[in-house]
């Protein structure tokens, strides 16, 4: 191969590799309870001139299993602290990450079901007895589902509720079961309960946070993540992101 042709070939190859690296888009796995809040945070992130990130919503447990099996997520924004720490223990992340928010569990009721929500145990028993189904996220996959079961047991409602439970892969799906009427009652995050889509079809009641383990939501950065993932990780800890989280009902560290 002539020298000039070889040089052109090497230069072209260098350009292709450089463009591929530059074009690498950060992929962020986000717990379903964060959907509305994260959408606003992502908009704020892009407004500062940052490149767009690819966002996938789902359950923290499913994302963790997928990352363990090689899924190319660069940043996990989890609904709890257990799954991110497990990724660190398995050598997938750069460290144990940080707690970015503390969530609140609520009960929601479909407006058309005519069920009254009250923090009176007597009224809650009436509501559960009247409900056709009660939607929760799978407790082994989603922290809000785990918290819901802890609450029901601590409040002495488990025995009357357990046979009416229907399980969803994540809290977003559990919420939609109530919105669509597949269930009359459900447990979800306050951030989802306050969203426009959900609030027009349901009403909600805050659950006593002393009756379930605090939902400390942690995020963790994977090894080899591109710069944009690191930038987003840092932005999630900014005053601007914390202000948005608080607006959606989260407490922040």
Cite the ranges covered by each PLM segment:
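Bacterial N-terminal signal peptides that target proteins for export
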Residues: 1-10
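Hydrophobic helical h-region of N-terminal Sec-dependent signal peptides
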Residues: 11-15
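Exported/periplasmic ABC-transporter solute-binding proteins
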Residues: 23-50, 54-56, 61, 65-71, ...
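Active-site phosphate-binding/coordination module
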Residues: 96
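Sec/Tat signal peptide C-region and signal peptidase I cleavage site
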Residues: 17-23
């Amino acid at each position: 191969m002539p020298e000039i042709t070889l040089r052109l070939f090497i230069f072209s190859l260098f350009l292709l590799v450089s463009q591929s690296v530059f074009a690498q888009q950060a992929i962020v796995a986000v717990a379903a309870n964060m959907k509305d809040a994260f959408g606003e945070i992502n908009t704020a992130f892009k407004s500062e001139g940052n490149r767009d990130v690819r966002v996938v919503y789902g359950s923290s447990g499913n994302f963790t299993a997928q990352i363990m099996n090689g899924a190319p997520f660069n940043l996990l924004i989890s609904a709890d602290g257990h799954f991110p720490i497990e990724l660190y223990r398995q050598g997938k992340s750069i460290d144990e990450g940080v707690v970015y928010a503390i969530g609140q569990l609520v009960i929601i009721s479909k407006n058309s079901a005519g069920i009254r929500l009250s923090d009176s145990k007597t009224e809650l028993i009436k509501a559960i007895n009247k409900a056709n189904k009660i939607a929760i996220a799978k407790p082994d996959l989603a922290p809000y589902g785990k918290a819901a079961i802890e609450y029901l047991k601590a409040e002495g409602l488990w025995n009357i509720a357990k046979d009416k439970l229907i399980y969803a892969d994540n809290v977003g799906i559990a919420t939609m079961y109530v919105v669509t009427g597949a269930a009359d009652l459900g447990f979800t995050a306050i951030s989802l309960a306050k969203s426009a889509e959900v609030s027009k079809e349901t009403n909600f009641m805050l659950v006593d946070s002393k009756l379930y383990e605090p939902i400390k939501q942690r995020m963790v950065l994977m090894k080899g993540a591109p710069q944009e993932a690191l930038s987003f990780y840092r932005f999630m800890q900014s005053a601007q992101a914390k202000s948005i989280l608080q607006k959606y009902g989260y407490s922040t560290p």
